[in-house]
Amino acid sequence: MWNGKKKAVTFSYDDGVTQDRRLVEMMNTYGVKGTFNLNSGMQSYANVWEHPKGLLIHRMNTEGLKELYQGHEIAAHCLTHADLPKYDEETICNEILEDKKNLEERFGQPVVGMAYPFGTYNDTVVDIARACGIRYSRTVERTGNFGLPEEPLTLNPTCHHNDADVMDLIDRFLASDSEEPQLFYLWGHSYEFDVDQNWDRMEEILKKLSGHDEIFYGTNREVLFGE
């Protein structure tokens, strides 16, 4: 399925925050690829908020992001990180379409994916996303397994990088000899590594998952659609 391989690994990180710089450098070092979900209406260093643990979280300025994320995929995360089910259909459509359009203009690549802000969605949101040209959208509901999604517009990840069993899941994935395609899908926010002071955790994850000849390393779009 993936250049003849039966296993694939992909990553998904949200919000376009300053910590993405370190994360991208690490991912590039280990030869893995991911998808970064951005809010084009909020992409500014001046857009800052305070985490409950006291850390100030900054988004990055737009300048230089095309070069930073080169080799990875850019996906929508809605114009203003809106909690979509709380809004009317026109607002939902605008949040998705405007973000998609802005990102395509800034990065020069088609935007076919999305991550639901706050992980919230309903049938109306899914239908509007599909009508807006979104082909897949990630939730925050972990599966704890490696099957491919039946409905890409409600794409549930394998796990979050902070899940207690993430290393055990990686070991299970690596040991699996299933004849069915197996996908390890990890998600999170890069600022969490500063908040939790556990960049070493991501280093360990990348060391375990990378460098396997039998695994395809791709963006969300590549592992889902082969393109």
Question: Where do the model's predicted regions map?
Answer:
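Glycan-processing catalytic domains of CAZymes
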Residues: 11-12, 76, 136-138, 147-171, ...
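Short beta->alpha connector loops
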Residues: 15-18, 117-121, 161-162
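Boundary/entry segment of secreted carbohydrate-active catalytic domains
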Residues: 1-19
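Hydrophobic "anchor" residues on beta-strands that sit immediately upstream
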Residues: 10-11, 73, 215
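A short acidic, amphipathic alpha-helical/loop segment
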Residues: 22-26, 124-128, 201, 205
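Metal-dependent polysaccharide deacetylase catalytic core of the NodB/CE4 family, i.e.
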Residues: 28-125, 130-135, 142-155, 182-193
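C-terminal domain-boundary segment and adjacent tail
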Residues: 1-2, 29-31, 40, 104, ...
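Active-site metal-binding loops of divalent metal-dependent hydrolases
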Residues: 13-16, 78, 190, 220
